[in-house]
Amino acid sequence: MEKLQIQKFGITKDGSKPYLYKMKNDAGMEVQVSDFGATLVNVTVLDQDKNPVEVVLGYEDAAGYENGTAAIGAIVGRNANRIGGACVTINGIDYKLAENDGKNNLHSGPDVYQKRMWRVVENGDDHVTFLLHSPDGDQGYPGALDMKVTYTLDEENGLTIHYEAVPDQDTVINMTNHSYFNLNGHKSGSVLHHRMQLLSDAFTPADAQSIPTGEVCSVDGTPMDFRSTKELGAEIDAAYEPLILGNGYDHNWVLKNEGRFDKVAEVTGDESGIVMEVWTDRPGVQVYTANFLENEAGRNGAVYQKRDAVCLETQNYPDAVHQKNFPEAICKKGETYDTKTAYRFHI
């Protein structure tokens, strides 16, 4: 493992001066993260010809992340994904949230974790730990907590993201990372020829506002079936209502890991030969094919467009606070929220 490098990463609107932290292992994989948003800024891995490939979309500096609207590289919290009606009831008390997606709440509203300065509380050559204090009432949620996010790079080309928090009241916690992956390289265009396998037999269909109906439906015989590896674009334009409503894939798949940290997905770049495995202990994964990216100016002159990337956002199911048959959405007072997701790369 090479020595951790730290450099300036621009300046924010309020005058804060974020830093960029670079980790690099002996296999040539490099990970860049920032204390602005605890953001995953860049991941570089070697392709089948030993050439370095930047496999996540991103911006030149902190200003890009501050001004961006697509949650590129973002640590999303306190609750990722959607809450119907922008309201949650905890212990009989209604808590109103921001309506920022029609009448619903998406990714906890406009005051997002990813556009705040986090504090580095620990770092080494192979890891960086960020901390954000989220006070009682933050984003409308009850309870204060200190959210810790640790990025760890290992010598086997694995990047692990570890989330930890202990709330002082019962509250919603559902964290994710919203990185956009293109395994052929961040400037290489469409990912529709990437191949994907999901270890999932079911998904949670949603309505026209992307709020789950409460059903859990089998993928059997549908374009949602990725149990056998197939191209992302093989059926993305099928005349299938969930795909029409989502403008492509933007759905939660039900995972079979039963709370264990296990492999849940695999994606392969058709040109680079780079394979990315996704491991998690979370019950769901949102696969999003960047259906609404348009003329997004990224780093090194890149301009990102629709379906130029795929997100695999490990999570609790969307709107779990309103669906009794979905996994528990509330983290109890004094309990530890502790979850890991890893992205492992190989050829």
Task: Cite the ranges covered by each PLM segment.
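An exposed, glycine/acidic-rich loop-and-rim segment of catalytic or binding clefts
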Residues: E2-I347
